[in-house]
């Protein structure tokens, strides 16, 4: 018996079965950098239509976590897919560099500014620290396989960006959106600074819940409003969980539309919202009471009530913000300690009292027992004071959600301070922003309603901060009036020019006389810095408008976590609308937060965090990228060892499919060996057509940012259409046909076209593996797949052909039925492999006609040694019914002997003396012109 191994076309490739990604990926990254991959992409895409994804800058502090990885990988998938779609899509990564977290870190190292180091030295240390953090984060982002201009990222602390941020503020001033005034802002006593809305988080806190009497100055006049006469004292009762704000009380708000009741019990009368009387009486433990009369809230407007301990009286005022959700229907109003209170206070001309210092302690001369006391400690003092004065109606502890500093996790207060604001309503900014929101595509679409409601309800934006490390507001204000200099815009440009050369320190080093000359004695420099959300929110102007690679185009897409509706999406919208009158983006895409396999938030204390560095070092970045792409990122994104293991399994299946393609392209030169479509075996054309259909779906999914559907379609193509059908069938032809025959070259032509498309589908997601496949593909080609576009040479079967896609879909179904019978026979130990079988298909007329169309090649599709078609009416009793109408199956042992070369059973073995042990087909392939295949 001869050894025919050398006559077979055995698969061979340098593409290894195991990815070994953790080891190989860093080597690839090194090559990408040395060979200038990002620059090569820029060059290849030069002059194409731009697509700009503007990077929301992560904060330059700490290691990257799994959430950062999700964000950067999603952005990279989009950038790469847009490049393949023929766009010039530069990616300029950025970092947010100013602000409190860095100050706090630097304070731990060098102390507070003005103590051991000067403010200038402190800023320099902050800059140095930010650079160190950026370098560390940059390495991890690059390791993820994210391509971008890492040598020239944008930093909000770049001198030019700092200067452009000042210019952005100047444009807002020019458009009339800047306001100044003492307004209540979120204030962190630990930071000693105001906080942006996005820097406030809510946690449960226990507070005193108190009902307080404000006695009527003239009880008779009040009783008359209710149409009654009484000699009992009358009080208007307020309910609050912040007793510490009572020293700043300047009014009591009622709702003009509500009915209020005068309720008598014991030796007093109280005024309560009529709908809340029973609820309040139950809360304060009073069972015997009577309603003497009712009136509208509007009837009580401007009646006066005595403050319980401050020695003055306050008016009853009307406001729509008063609800019946809780309390008494009367709201204690302190314009210096709350935005609603402030707004209504402005309407009634109330004093904006602020008796609290920046450290959270009462200022001198507030009240004898309160001066110097920290506000949250003062709650107990005030409760006792109210008891003494006979003003405390009820007191209990209550747990509720309370605003806290995102950094310190400590409760914040509302505190009126002199600040600068972007006015939401001064020049129509709110209305224009709401109009702009409607012109943006929000993905998912619920993002639109979310940001609309935030814009509708948000207060003026306080953009000033009392910090050391930040972009200076760069205003010169009059020492007496605090009004900005008449030449403010011109002066700000002068400051910006200096900052562009020397950084923000130029502002603090600036001698006021240098710019103001003789006016210097009347003016002072504002000490305030800009809110860091202004820094990042103005990057559409300071970066996108300024970078040459964007060619003056605005951003197409912003992509961040769903918390950024109130953060970066909001600040960017406000600033862009204030400067340009339009939104800074055309599309906004949000992703959810990462949770563990059980849906719990990631937490170091629970110990359920997943480190991207660990995943990359163990499994490789392509597995991490595949996990991100496989997840519907619009909701919560679950990650665990088990979930990553599933991604690794998916990866292996895709890799093995690619390896099969490459191994079977051994010896194929597309320039010499391609078979024309019309001369190809029909099944091969079908396979290329399946790739064409898959590509249409995949490109649509990429365009819609539906990456989990890209992976599902890719897996369906690799595992079902290719793996369990086409690749199974072609092994025989690929391995046993004459090496240079049309039968084999047709198959290789199909494999070549398909892998050219497949490697491109993979490239945005499994970037390292796609690069590895690209290097193994036959034929002349560019150095990198990432400089290419989607493959355009796919073709398929025409619908008008007899053996069209519909035909092959039916054949697939027949094969599936045959496979079930073969599988059962294997289980029953009747046969070991399908080639030991002969199959007879008893079919109805229509199906029989289709099956007979393949002639002798039907057996290759069914992977049996023999296949016969017969009339269903002739089916014997032992024929197995199938799930297909009009088909019964009989399985028997194949006739003849097993050919040692192709392993098929044949009755013509030994008919050629020189190859006595071969079947006739193999003799033709070894010694003749090679078998002909037309269908399969």
From Swiss-Prot:
Q: How is the cofactor bound?
A: Binds 1 zinc ion per subunit.
- Domain remark text: IleRS has two distinct active sites: one for aminoacylation and one for editing. The misactivated valine is translocated from the active site to the editing site, which sterically excludes the correctly activated isoleucine. The single editing site contains two valyl binding pockets, one specific for each substrate (Val-AMP or Val-tRNA(Ile)).
**Species of origin:** Proteus mirabilis (strain HI4320)
Co-factor requirement: Zn(2+)
Q: Which reaction does it catalyse?
A: tRNA(Ile) + L-isoleucine + ATP = L-isoleucyl-tRNA(Ile) + AMP + diphosphate
Q: What is this protein called?
A: Isoleucine--tRNA ligase
In terms of Pfam families, this protein maps to: Anticodon_1 (PF08264), tRNA-synt_1 (PF00133), zf-FPG_IleRS (PF06827)
Question: What are its E.C. numbers?
Answer: 6.1.1.5
Q: Which GO terms describe its cellular component?
A: cytosol
């Amino acid at each position: 018996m001869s050894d025919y191994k050398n006559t077979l076309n055995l698969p061979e490739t340098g593409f290894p079965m195991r990815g070994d990604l953790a080891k190989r990926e860093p080597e690839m990254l090194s090559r990408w950098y040395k060979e200038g991959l990002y620059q090569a992409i820029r060059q290849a895409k030069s002059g194409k239509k731009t697509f700009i994804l503007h990077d929301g800058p992560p904060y330059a502090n700490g290691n990257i976590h799994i959430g950062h990885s999700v964000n950067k990988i999603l952005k990279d998938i989009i950038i790469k897919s847009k490049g393949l779609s023929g766009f010039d899509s530069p990616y300029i990564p950025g970092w947010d560099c100013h602000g409190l977290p860095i100050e706090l870190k630097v304070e731990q190292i060098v102390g507070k500014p003005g103590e051991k180091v000067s403010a200038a030295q402190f800023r320099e240390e902050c800059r140095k620290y930010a650079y160190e953090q950026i370098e560390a984060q940059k390495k991890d982002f690059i390791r993820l396989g994210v391509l971008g201009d890492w040598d020239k990222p944008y930093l909000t602390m770049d001198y030019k960006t700092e200067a452009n941020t000042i210019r952005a503020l100047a444009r807002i001033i020019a458009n009339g959106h800047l306001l100044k005034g003492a307004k209540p802002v979120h204030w962190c006593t630990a930071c000693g600074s105001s906080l942006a809305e996005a820097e406030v988080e809510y946690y449960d806190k226990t507070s005193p819940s108190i009902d307080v009497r404000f006695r009527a100055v003239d009880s008779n006049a009040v009783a008359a409003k209710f149409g009654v006469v009484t000699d009992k004292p009358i009080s208007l009762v307020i309910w609050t969980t912040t007793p510490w704000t009572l020293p700043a009380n300047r009014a009591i708000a009622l709702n003009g539309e509500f009915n209020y009741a005068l309720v008598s019990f014991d030796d007093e009368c109280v005024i309560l919202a009529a709908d809340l009387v029973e609820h309040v009486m139950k809360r304060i433990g009073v069972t015997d009471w009577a309603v003497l009369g009712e009136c509208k809230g509007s009837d009580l407007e401007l009646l006066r009530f005595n403050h319980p301990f401050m020695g003055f009286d306050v008016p009853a005022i009307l406001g729509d913000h008063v609800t019946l959700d809780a309390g008494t229907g009367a709201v204690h109003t302190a314009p210096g300690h709350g935005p609603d209170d402030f707004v209504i206070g402005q309407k009634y001309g109330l004093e904006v009292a602020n008796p609290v210092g920046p450290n959270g302690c009462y200022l001198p001369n507030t009240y004898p027992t309160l001066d110097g006391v920290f506000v949250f400690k003062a709650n107990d003092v005030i409760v006792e004071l109210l008891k003494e004065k006979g003003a405390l109606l009820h007191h209990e502890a209550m747990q509720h959600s309370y605003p806290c500093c995102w950094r310190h996790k400590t409760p914040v207060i509302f505190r009126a301070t002199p600040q600068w604001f972007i006015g939401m309503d001064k020049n129509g900014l709110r209305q224009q922003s709401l109009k702009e929101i409607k012109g943006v595509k929000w993905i998912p679409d619920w993002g639109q309603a979310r940001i609309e409601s935030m814009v509708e309800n948000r207060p003026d934006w306080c953009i000033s901060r009392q910090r050391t490390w930040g972009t200076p507001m760069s205003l010169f204000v009059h020492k007496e009036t605090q009004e900005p200099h008449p030449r403010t815009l011109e002066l700000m440009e002068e400051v910006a020019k200096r900052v562009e050369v020397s950084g923000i320190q130029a502002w603090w080093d600036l001698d006021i006389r240098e710019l103001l000359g003789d006016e210097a004695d009347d003016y002072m420099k504002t000490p305030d810095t800009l809110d860091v959300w202004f820094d990042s929110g103005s990057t559409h102007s300071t970066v996108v408008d300024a970078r040459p690679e964007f060619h003056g185009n605005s951003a197409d897409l912003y992509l961040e976590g769903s918390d950024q509706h109130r953060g970066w999406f909001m600040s960017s919208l406000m600033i862009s609308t204030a400067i340009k009158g339009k939104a800074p983006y055309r599309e906004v895409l949000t992703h959810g937060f990462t949770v563990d396999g059980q849906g719990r938030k990631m937490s170091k204390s629970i110990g359920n965090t997943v480190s991207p560095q660990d995943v990359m070092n163990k499994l490789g970045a392509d597995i991490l990228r595949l996990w991100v792409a496989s997840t519907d990122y619009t909701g919560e994104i679950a990650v665990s060892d088990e979930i990553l293991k599933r991604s690794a399994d998916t990866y292996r299946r895709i890799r093995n499919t690619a390896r099969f393609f490459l191994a079977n392209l051994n010896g194929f030169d597309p320039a010499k060996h391609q078979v024309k479509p019309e001369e190809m075996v029909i099944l091969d054309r079908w396979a290329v057509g399946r790739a064409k259909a898959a590509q249409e779906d995949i490109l649509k999914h990429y365009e819609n940012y539906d990456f989990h559907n890209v992976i599902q379609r890719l897996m369906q193509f690799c595992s079902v259409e290719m793996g369990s059908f086409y690749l199974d069938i072609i092994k025989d032809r690929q391995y046993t046909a004459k090496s240079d025959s049309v039968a084999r070259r047709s198959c290789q032509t199909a494999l070549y076209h398909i892998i050219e498309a497949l490697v491109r589908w993979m490239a945005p997601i499994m970037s390292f593996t796609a690069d590895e496949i690209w290097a193994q593909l036959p034929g002349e080609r560019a150095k990198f797949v990432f400089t290419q576009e989607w493959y355009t040479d796919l073709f398929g079967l025409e619908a008008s052909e007899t053996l069209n896609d519909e035909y092959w879909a039916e054949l697939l179904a027949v094969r599936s039925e045959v496979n079930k019978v073969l599988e059962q026979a294997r289980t029953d130990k009747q046969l070991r492999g399908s080639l030991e079988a002969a199959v007879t298909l008893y079919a109805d007329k229509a199906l029989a006609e289709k099956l007979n169309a393949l002639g002798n090649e039907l057996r290759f599709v069914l992977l049996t040694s023999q296949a016969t078609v017969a009339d269903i009416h002739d089916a014997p009793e032992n024929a197995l019914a199938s799930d297909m109408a009009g088909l019964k199956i009989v399985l028997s042992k194949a006739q003849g002997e097993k050919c040692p070369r192709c392993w098929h059973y044949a009755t013509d073995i030994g008919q050629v003396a020189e190859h006595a042990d071969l079947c006739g087909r193999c003799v033709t392939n070894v010694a003749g012109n090679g078998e002909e295949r037309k269908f399969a």
